[in-house]
Amino acid sequence: MPDIGLRLGGEVLVIDGAMGTMLQRHDIPAGQSLMQLNVTAPELVEEVHRLYALAGADCATTNSFGGSRHKLDAYGLGEQVVDLNRAAVRLARAGGAAHILADMGPTGLVMEPLGTATFDEVFEQFAEQASALAAEQPDALFIETMTDIAEARCAVLAARSVTDLPVFVTVTFGLNGRMDLSGTGPEAAAVILEAAGAAAVGMNCGLGPEQMLPLVERMALATTLPIIVQPNAGMPRLQDGVTVFPGTADEMGTYAARFVDAGASLVGSCCGSTPSFTGAIVDFAKTRPLAERREPEPGVVVAGPRGVVRVGGGAPLVRVGERINPTGKKRLAESLRAGRLDVVREYAIEQADAGADLLDVNVGAAGVDQQSVLPAAVLALSGLVDQPLVLDTTDPVALEAALRVYPGRALINSVSGESASMEAVLPLARRYGAAVVLLALDDDGIPATAGARVDVVRKVRDEAWSHGLTDRDLVADTLVLAAATQADGAGA
């Protein structure tokens, strides 16, 4: 069977359906983790996989949704995290599907700024699970049912830190078209997760196929990555005190065809579905030609948890608010030295209300520990304003700390043609999926002529390319000089 990466762009791949719906038909004791069945009743799990494969599923999703240590600790199973996850992959493979997607669900921890869990705590949870799953060589890791873009992004970064396997990720939207915890829409989710290194993005759970269709259409316009769609079997409702899903297999199949026409290439089903739903998806959509995907608009796209901004490529002028900079601002500098962020928040709200599209964040001042204050400011602002952030520091340690925790795609301000700057900044931009401003300044200072400054930008661009960045990651700042200060070179 061809590598899953080779199949993604050429055909519709059908993903299986709900695991829990099928397992809960058996007499499973209340309060037991379904993952425990991977070792206590493996035949039940394997049989579910086999039924979905017989229905035509190309991809089996492992029974490891609740497989983080934190989730397993709730059942006293934390020390079995490796064994339970590895068993999940083996059982999925035994079921006979062509491809194995190693499933990873939310950790159950709520990350800063919405909760108290730190980035590093959640990162370690995902890295441990991803490492265990990857040891059994599935075709891809599959992060799913994410309601907070910060956790989804953290999961992708953690997975990529321990394996070279492709990482698929789906998020869950509410009826308002936004992720429940972070308020992220489909466009921002696609931009942020693609930048983090996802190989395919999409949505699952939360909604039925009818409600999901317009969100698929929107997401498909925001990325060129393969789109994954796995709706519930209709919108859930309570019936005699029991949650039921009213959708039918034929309805799912009909919408599966529409999902493909909207740009999806991996289609499955979620809560309430059974192998009959998978069979309907196969019947209605498996042989359907993939839609012609439109290229995203040109320019560099950055995103915060709740907003997307395009820079250049014919986009309207972007206004960058630069008041969050302690230079010449005694009140701001004093608050930062004291470890307070009230003035940062105040300036951010003022600039957002005044129409800024992006907010530059600079906390560099004597006596300020940038390595702790910059990430703290980034977290505070990401939960406060919709505008994407521009991270403005010459301290590479502070920059990395801020890039790690920012639940979006930041713009780095900036990298110059100085050797030390390129060596420090460009690997960070690549690792964390950030865009970066290229500054027309090198080890010899600011060139006197416009042509020489453009040459410096080209040099930095070439170095950025060598680090795996593309023109869609790069913004040029050619440092236009006033004729009054540089009369000889202003027009050269």
Regions found by a protein language model. Give the residues of each.
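Domain-level signal for soluble alpha/beta catalytic cores
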Residues: M1-A492
